[in-house]
């Protein structure tokens, strides 16, 4: 649900941020209202990002980070090995030896 909310919020901000190409209106009050709404949405978005960043910093665990880094290095080493084996097999198949 959280990702859907952020996607909907992102799309709403994208729509509000883009200007619609059409006939020009003489009413300057509507653009001021749109600017105010957009400004409030951006301030809400920035405060939500800051709160998420603070929460991440509070819950940051070095042991989990070390495990993730170790898992990444092991999996990338395994992928390098398997890619080398695949390349050797492919070259052997193409050469016909």
Swiss-Prot record:
One GO-annotated biological process of the protein: cholesterol efflux
- Please outline how this chain is modified post-translation: Proapolipoprotein C-II is synthesized as a sialic acid containing glycoprotein which is subsequently desialylated prior to its proteolytic processing. Proapolipoprotein C-II, the major form found in plasma undergoes proteolytic cleavage of its N-terminal hexapeptide to generate the mature form apolipoprotein C-II, which occurs as the minor form in plasma.
In the record, which residues are listed under signal peptide? 1-22
Where does this polypeptide localize?
Secreted
InterPro entries, sorted: Apo-CII (IPR008019), ApoC-II_dom_sf (IPR023121)
Q: Which GO terms describe its molecular function?
A: lipase inhibitor activity; lipid binding; lipoprotein lipase activator activity; molecular function activator activity; phospholipase activator activity; phospholipase binding
UniProt-annotated stretches for the region Lipid binding: 63-71
Q: Which intervals of the chain are annotated as region Lipoprotein lipase cofactor?
A: 75-97
Which Pfam families would you find in this protein's record?
A: Apo-CII
Which superkingdom, per the lineage?
Answer: Eukaryota
Give GO cellular component annotations, separated by semicolons: chylomicron; extracellular space; intermediate-density lipoprotein particle; low-density lipoprotein particle; spherical high-density lipoprotein particle; very-low-density lipoprotein particle
Please give the family membership noted in the entry.
Answer: Belongs to the apolipoprotein C2 family.
Functionally, this protein is described as follows:
Component of chylomicrons, very low-density lipoproteins (VLDL), low-density lipoproteins (LDL), and high-density lipoproteins (HDL) in plasma. Plays an important role in lipoprotein metabolism as an activator of lipoprotein lipase.
Protein name as it appears in the record: Apolipoprotein C-II
Q: Which organism is it from?
A: Rattus norvegicus
């Amino acid at each position: 649900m959280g990702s859907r909310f952020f996607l909907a919020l992102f799309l709403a901000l994208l729509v509000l941020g883009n200007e619609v190409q059409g006939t020009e209106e003489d009413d300057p009050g509507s653009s001021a209202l749109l600017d105010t709404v957009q400004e409030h949405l951006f301030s809400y978005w920035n405060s939500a990002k800051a709160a998420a960043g603070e929460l991440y910093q509070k819950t940051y665990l070095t042991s989990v980070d070390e495990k993730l880094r170790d898992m990444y290095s092991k999996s990338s080493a395994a992928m390098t090995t398997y890619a080398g084996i695949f390349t050797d097999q492919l070259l052997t198949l193409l050469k016909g030896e």
